[in-house]
Amino acid sequence: MSVLCLGEVWLELNAAMAPELTETFRAQTGGWGAGFCRRYAALGGQAALLAQLGADPFGRKLAAQLARDGVDCSLLCFTDAFPTPVVFTGADTALPYRAHTAGLALGPEQLEAAPFRGSSAFCFSSAGLVDSPLRLAHLKALAAARDAGALCCYLPRLAQAAPYWPQREALCQTALQFLDRADVLFLEESDLLLLFGSRELRTALFALFTGHVQLIFFYKKDRILAFTRSVMASAAKKDQSPALVLYRMEKMMLPVSALPRLNKSELNALIG
């Protein structure tokens, strides 16, 4: 079984200094969905990317690189109507050119239910939830994943998504609307700060365990915490990326119905 990720893929032009001060850029594959799929594939898992690229040289280049990295690109869409997005990065600055590009133009009518039936999990993040056809595609994908029994996993990554949103307040409000649609949350301290005004998880747990949410992974600077509604586990932070934790969940063959019954030893096996 495979993991499905919905998001954008863009050509990232990276420089060692601020983009306006450099003459040389290094081209690489950008976008949260692309990055997550590459990390999952590197672990030996099967990761398929749901995204749309322009039917242009940049789009073909990115798709070829993802395929070389072991990502299943069979669900990628290509369009002549919009170009592949480009993002300039450097010196902690991101200048995205994506407002009228292929990634955000991926609409719900382009998604089929069949790929979700053979998937163990569906993963998404916040950058692609900006007001666009892609946000509507996320809603359809969540419904299809839930109908298929796949785990719905949300990685808000609000600090990383903020440069790609016109307003931070709109980003946070949208993230709050999507939290309870997931079965599993992967949170960072910066997520809590932006959503609830505090880095303390205790102040947010009651608000987080609503809707479909059954399992929360919380990444602190030096530790990872795992919570169900009744059990908590903790481990020293090493290299337990969300991709690795999800890979372990797939190996344990955990269906959605098993999440509320996870015990402390099982949580430790996921994060240890």
Predicted regions located by residue number:
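Glycine-rich phosphate/adenosyl-contacting loop at the front of the ribokinase-like
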Residues: 1-71, 263-272
